[in-house]
From Swiss-Prot:
Coiled coil: none
Family as reported in the entry's similarity comment: Belongs to the class-I aminoacyl-tRNA synthetase family.
Enzyme class: ligase
Originating species: Geobacillus sp. (strain WCH70)
This protein's name: Arginine--tRNA ligase
Motif 'HIGH' region, residue range(s) on this chain: 132-142
Protein's gene: argS
UniProt keyword Endoplasmic reticulum, yes or no: no
Localisation per UniProt entry: Cytoplasm
Disulfide pattern: none
Length: 556
């Protein structure tokens, strides 16, 4: 807990003590003390609505309650300079902000670990994201899911959760049969043999490339092979080719996974049969019209769901239930799925299945990723200029850069549509948020280099009482918010809280830089203190940007 968190706790304790001392409630009956940062600076550093919370119990006007609470408070116990009462009874606290300078050596000493919290308490959390079918390129929806998922994992780890990152490989089912048939057709065509593409085939350039590669390396070796053997080979070849491509694209996007979980393994291990037997044993399965049904309405779904069709084939739901059963057996306290917008209706049946298996349905959390619209020159970009098809993740990365892509995708709440302005993403101006933030880091790094050239060091004993101007205090306050921003982003599953935070920190830095002279050869101790402040800003910017997968350049 850093000095800011400690101070907030002291204020809360002092409010609680004052409430008890004033006779409004016994210690165990005092409502939770809520401290908020007022929107207007004029309303102080912190504010509480405790008087309103107590009004019903005390049967007094909130303002009168607030006055009594203030009378019983000891300001010296929490570095409070002034307290006032506003509106119907809000209590506003104005801090003696000199205590904030203690943050500077704390941050420098913590380095890359600054911002770490323990709200997760080591809980085992699994985050499954991207999980695109291995039948073609990753597109914009996958890219946004990758950026949000990876950022969320980084944030959860920073907040003390034990995180497993998982990609579910959809390597069973009809789409993989169609992949094998598509590879077969392209292979025959590469040899000059007429072969029709399957009705639901994959027409991407990558499948044409696979066909050519096979023809070049193996000639007509597979033409005369038994068809089932040939398709089994093409299935594996095509699947591995596409998976390696996906892994490479994701690695280049700074996204890695701990587990690549194969859907096929659910069949070969008997886990699907085992899950079906368990649901049957619990009385949640019935037969109707030649099909096998899951009685999901028992658990709040709007209708029962087919698990096995009349022809004996499985619906998507059955292996998905088996997969979630396996997740739960691995001991995760939370399983977080990051799904595309088209999966919204799938959530109730999945939660129903989890409850039917005997688990708490709230163990499953689903974050929905809404659609992305690309804009260039003020117009919506629907197709790639190069391929005439949907824009891929790699194309976007190459067009606007990795950092801009990662930042923009994590900039808004994932459940809202995102309009991605490609012109803005590449512009070197303060209107471009990623440029603005990275420039703050480059600016701080430049100041630190200048300090080295002047042989000024921020190490050793510092006279931190030089740090006292309004802009310096604003910067310190923002630095002190980082751990709570991490905790909030983790608990609320909000990566965009960090993009918002890092932008605010950059803004505070630019504002300070424009108002103050950092290095003054005439005042060595003041310069050293300010250099230490700049080092603390540099560390915090680096740590925040790392959470959202964005680099922190030293020069721009």
């Amino acid at each position: 807990m850093n000095i800011v968190e400690q101070m907030k706790e002291r204020i809360k304790e002092e409010i609680k003590r004052a409430v008890v001392s004033a006779g409004f409630a016994a210690e165990e009956e005092v409502p939770e003390v809520i401290l908020e940062v007022p929107r207007e600076k004029a309303h102080g550093d912190y504010s509480t609505n405790m008087a309103m919370q107590l009004a019903r119990i005390a049967k007094k006007p909130p303002r009168a309650i607030a006055e009594e609470i203030v009378q019983h408070m000891d300001k010296t116990k929490a570095s409070i300079e002034k307290i006032d009462i506003a509106g119907p009874g809000f209590i506003n606290f104005y801090m003696d902000n000199r205590y904030l300078t203690e943050l500077i050596p704390t941050i420098i000493q913590a380095g890359a670990s600054y911002g770490e919290t323990n709200v997760g308490k080591g809980q085992k959390v699994q985050v499954e994201f991207v999980s695109a079918n291995p039948t073609g390129d990753l597109h914009l929806g996958h890219a946004r899911g990758a950026a949000v998922g990876d950022s969320l994992c980084n944030i959860l780890e920073k907040a003390g959760f034990d995180v497993t990152r998982e990609y579910y490989i959809n390597d069973a089912g009809n789409q993989i049969y169609n992949l094998a048939k598509s590879v077969e057709a392209r292979y025959f065509q590469a040899l000059g043999i007429d072969k029709e593409m399957p009705e639901d085939g994959y027409y991407g350039e990558d499948i044409i490339e696979i066909g050519k590669k096979l023809a070049e390396e193996h000639g007509d070796k597979y033409v005369h092979m038994d068809e089932q053997e040939r398709l089994a080979f093409f299935r594996e070849y095509g699947l591995n080719y596409e998976l390696e491509k996906i892994k490479k694209d994701l690695a280049d996007f700074r996204v890695t996974f701990d587990v690549w979980y194969s859907e096929t393994s659910l069949y070969t291990s008997g886990k699907i049969d085992e899950t079906l037997a368990l649901l049957r044993e619990r009385g949640h399965i019935y037969e109707k019209d030649g099909a096998t049904w899951f009685r999901s309405t028992t658990f709040g779904d709007d209708k029962d769901r087919v698990l096995i069709k009349k022809d004996g084939t499985y619906t998507y739901l059955l292996p998905d239930i088996a997969y979630h059963q396996d997740k739960l057996r691995r001991g995760f306290t939370k399983i977080i799925n990051i799904w595309g917008a088209d999966h919204h209706g799938y959530i109730p049946r999945m939660k129903a299945a989890i409850e039917a298996l005997g688990y708490d349905p709230d163990v499953l959390e689903v974050e929905i990723i809404q659609l992305v619209n690309l804009y260039q020159n003020g117009e919506r970009v629907k197709m790639s200029k190069r391929t005439g098809k949907a824009v891929t993740m790699r194309e976007l990365m190459e067009e606007v850069g990795l950092d801009a892509t990662r930042y923009f995708f994590a900039m808004r709440s994932s459940d809202t549509h995102l309009d991605f302005d490609m012109d803005l993403a590449v512009s070197q101006s303060n209107e471009n948020p990623v440029y603005y933030v990275q420039y703050a880091h480059a600016r701080v790094s430049s100041i630190l280099r200048q300090g080295e050239e002047l042989q000024l060091s921020y190490e050793g004993d510092l006279q931190l009482d030089y740090i006292q101007t309004e802009k310096e205090i604003e910067l310190l306050k923002k630095l002190g918010e980082f751990p709570s921003a991490v905790s909030e982003a983790a608990i609320k599953r909000m990566p965009h809280r960090i993009t918002g935070y890092v932008f605010e920190l950059a803004s505070a830095l630019h504002s300070f830089y424009n108002a103050e002279k950092v290095l003054d050869p005439e005042n060595i101790e003041k310069s050293r203190a300010r250099l230490a402040l700049m080092k603390a800003v540099q560390i915090t910017l680096q740590n925040a940007l790392a959470l959202i997968g964005v680099s922190a350049p030293e020069k721009m």
